[in-house]
Amino acid sequence: MEYLMIALKLIVGLSILNVWLVRSKKSTPWRGGDANNIVEEFKAYGLPVWFMWTIGTLKVALAVLLLASIFYAQVEAIAAFGIALLMLGAVSMHIKIGDPLKKSFPAFTFLVLSLVIALL
């Protein structure tokens, strides 16, 4: 079970870092609305740029904490529950603008995985 939890933390943490630090300026099939990058995606949701920076900072910080929790278990709950909360927000934004359900699949998957990490 310990190795499974490490794998889940690596998958969630590294995926979030990839989205926000590596692929933020790239188009993906998962972006909200017709957005080609994160800035356009937040505009599609009707959210200001400062909110994008706030959410991005929180997601990156929580992803780093989740990765750190592999070695420091005391930060696991705050990282996993924090990511779950942010992913719930992401899913709700996709629903708000009427995106097809498939666009919210990654956020929903990370929501579920974060809850598994937090609760097991």
Question: What are these regions, as identified by a protein language model?
Answer:
Residues 1-120:
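Membrane-interface extramembranous regions
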